[in-house]
């Protein structure tokens, strides 16, 4: 019984140490921001993530920051181009797989005069993020693809008016942009 108690105590201590190491880079917990709003989408059977994104892009006036693992959605790419055409500062970070992917929006976006860089440092740049006017953020499992909208079980989360969350995503976007080519 004593050996078992010592083993449990050791396991608890090891688990605590492991937990601290694992979560040391996580932001501290904080309450939702007063006045902030949150929207979610679940596809393929719930609210359209693609429509949510296109609407947010259409309402963007100053800056649009994008991080994408896979970006092949024609409606989303067209909305991004329209944003650029009306004077929005659009910048995009893509995973290296998008350089050779057959239907990637990378070439379309570059041809539209949009700054597109490739994040080659991690094994996979698996982010799916858009930051609109440094005021709202969309993130989730939703890749910016037709398959994500129509065939996959995906989710998205739009945070509007929570400056702390938006700032964290902008800071991360800037860091990924800094190390991309």
Name each model-derived stretch.
Residues 1-44, 50-51, 98-100, 174-181:
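Short, small/polar-rich loop/turn modules that mediate ligand/substrate recognition or access, typified
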Residues 33-34, 57-59, 85, 109-110, ...:
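Extracellular/periplasmic catalytic domains that process cell-envelope and extracellular macromolecules
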Residues 41, 65-67, 91-95, 117-118, ...:
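Structural recognition of the beta-strand scaffold that forms the well-ordered cores
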Residues 52, 56-62, 165-167, 173:
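DNA replication sliding-clamp ring fold and its partner-interaction surfaces
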Residues 55-115:
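Primarily the HKD phosphodiesterase
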Residues 69, 129, 169:
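Short, structured motif recognition centered on aromatic/hydrophobic residues
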Residues 70-74, 96-100, 122-125, 136-137, ...:
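Solvent-exposed loop/turn segments at secondary-structure junctions
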Residues 136-181:
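Signature of lipid phosphatidyltransferase scaffolds
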């Amino acid at each position: 019984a004593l050996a078992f108690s010592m083993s449990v105590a050791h396991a608890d201590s090891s688990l605590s140490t492991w937990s601290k190491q694992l979560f040391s880079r996580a932001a501290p917990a904080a309450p939702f921001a007063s006045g902030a709003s949150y929207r979610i989408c679940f596809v393929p059977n719930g609210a359209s993530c693609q429509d949510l994104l296109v609407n947010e892009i259409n309402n963007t006036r100053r800056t649009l920051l994008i991080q994408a693992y896979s970006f092949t959605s024609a409606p989303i790419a067209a909305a991004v181009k329209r944003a650029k055409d009306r004077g929005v500062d659009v910048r995009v970070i893509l995973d290296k797989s998008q350089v050779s992917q057959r239907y990637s929006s990378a070439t379309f976006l570059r041809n539209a005069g949009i700054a597109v860089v490739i994040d080659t440092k991690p094994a996979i740049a698996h982010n799916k993020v858009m930051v609109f006017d440094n005021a709202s953020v969309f993130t989730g499992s939703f890749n910016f693809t037709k398959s994500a909208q129509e065939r996959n079980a995906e989710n998205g989360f739009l945070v509007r008016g929570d400056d702390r969350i938006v700032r964290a995503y902008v800071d991360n976007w800037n860091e990924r942009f800094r190390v991309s080519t």
